[in-house]
Amino acid sequence: HPISEDNRKINGQHFAKQGEVVRVTPRVHIKSPEYKQIYGSLIGTRYEGKCPDLQVGDKFYEFEGFIKPWKKRKSKNMIRHGVEQSPYIVIDNTKGGSDRFIRRSIVARNHNDAIKEVWLYEKGGLRLFFKNGKFR
């Protein structure tokens, strides 16, 4: 997907500065022995077989970006695709989608509290936007 390696590093560095252990995770086939080693905690959950982008402590985060040009529906799609991979999502909001619109997209897609955290990547940094059912 369109998230660059530089953005992954910036996002990983943000969590590392908070004292978290961060690991960029590779894409591996579910039947390979590496999958169980890397993503073992996902086995038996709705995310089994998925390969989120980053592990922060014991949480797996999925980064969602977009291909230009920016359109409103892209933030909806980023949330929808992100929640298919992990309940912890980082959205590329470099084009400055409004908080109101992103909030509405989360509420519409947060069935059974499937979304635990949403971070927004803006201006080279991360901002916590949603956590455990509450907007920040």
Spans of features found by a protein language model:
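Metal-dependent nuclease catalytic core centered on acidic motifs
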Residues: H1-G40, T45, F66-R136
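Conserved catalytic cores of phosphodiester-cleaving nucleases, focusing on short active-site segments
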Residues: L54-I67
